[in-house]
Amino acid sequence: MSMYRAPQTDDAIAELDDRNQQIVAAAYDLLDEEGLEGLTIRAVLQRTGLARRALYDRFAGKDDLVLAVFAHTLRRAAEQFGEQVRDLPDPLARLHHIVTAIVIGRAAIDGDWQGGQRRSAALSREHLRLAEARPVELQKAVSPLIDLIATILSEGMAEGQVRAGPPSWMALLVYNLVSTTVHSQLLAEEAAIPDRQRRSELAVEIWEFCRRAIAA
């Protein structure tokens, strides 16, 4: 069985040195505390104690910082999912796990159904905006997870579980379906406590839709 790993990239957004990690960590905290409105360059500088020049040496502005948050989040997600599915019995079982985990979100890992709601809703809004404003950079940021899904689909084709087709394109379709639906759900839940039962039911519905679309 393959050892799934997030692809390595030399993209400056994805490669985080210690200073970049400090900045991205501050962005995470600000999004958790105040949502998108709280994520300003001034707030990041105050939180990190960095000089303005030190931040602008790494990020041209707020959009680049948000892209770095996406890149870091999706790369870590791909690594975690790769480890989680490594011992599952077949490609469809592995993809099922990933789709379900994306829909359920943070609670799939630590059982916290309320943590990170502001951040998740804020990032959903930014994902939709950056898909139009910075599509190439956003695609690079999310590519580790799409590449992982493509690898699993390719193996599913080899084992006769997944219909023949271009794995990368099919992976993009799966990701877009899942992520767009999750964004809508997160924005609907922004001012409320997440509905655990509804989220679980949604995961089942989305997986069934994906399964029927890719099944051999």
Region spans (language model):
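Amphipathic, non-transmembrane alpha-helical scaffold segments
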Residues: 16, 20, 66, 70, ...
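Generic hydrophobic, amphipathic alpha-helix propensity
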Residues: 16-27, 44, 69-73, 77, ...
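Short amphipathic alpha-helical elements of helix-turn-helix/winged-helix folds
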Residues: 26-30, 101, 105, 177
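Short coil/turn segments at alpha/beta junctions that flank glycine-rich nucleotide-binding fingerprints
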Residues: 33-37, 88, 109, 159-160
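Hydrophobic alpha-helical connector segments
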Residues: 68, 82-114, 171-174, 200-203
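Short secondary-structure transition hinges
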Residues: 103-151, 161, 168-169
